[in-house]
């Protein structure tokens, strides 16, 4: 991730990209060291290492992420990103890049990943 996310919207797009590419390295760069991710119903993990571990488990089940911010409220270096099925708190670091501090991704917000349009698979 060259230079990181320059806006909260960019951060959402980069998270979607990390899911599509299934890149643990890219995923880790999007979260603060002590970040919290809540996904897969009520599963809560803390820190970059645990977040990457959970993401890899989600990828094994062909889960993806769709960036669809509905509203962004920003106060200085902190922003709240509201999506249809979740909410994320993000902060701009000293390097100017935005990172997730808290990410709440509901089960509905994590669609199964399409795999070559095989019959019987849902989008």
Residue ranges and their predicted role:
Residues 1-26, 36-123:
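A beta-strand edge to alpha-helix "cap/lid" segment located at domain peripheries
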């Amino acid at each position: 991730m060259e230079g990181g996310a320059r806006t909260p919207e960019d951060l959402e797009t980069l998270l979607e990209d990390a899911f599509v590419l299934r890149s643990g390295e890219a995923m880790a760069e999007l979260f603060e060291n002590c970040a919290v991710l809540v996904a897969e119903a009520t599963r809560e993990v803390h820190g970059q290492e645990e977040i990457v571990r959970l993401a890899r488990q989600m990828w094994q089940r062909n889960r993806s992420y769709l960036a669809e911010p509905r509203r962004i409220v920003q106060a200085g270096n902190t922003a709240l990103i509201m999506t249809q099925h979740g909410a994320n708190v993000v902060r701009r670091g000293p390097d100017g890049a935005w990172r997730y501090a808290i990410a709440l991704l509901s089960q509905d917000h994590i669609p199964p990943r399409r795999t070559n349009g095989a019959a019987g698979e849902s989008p």
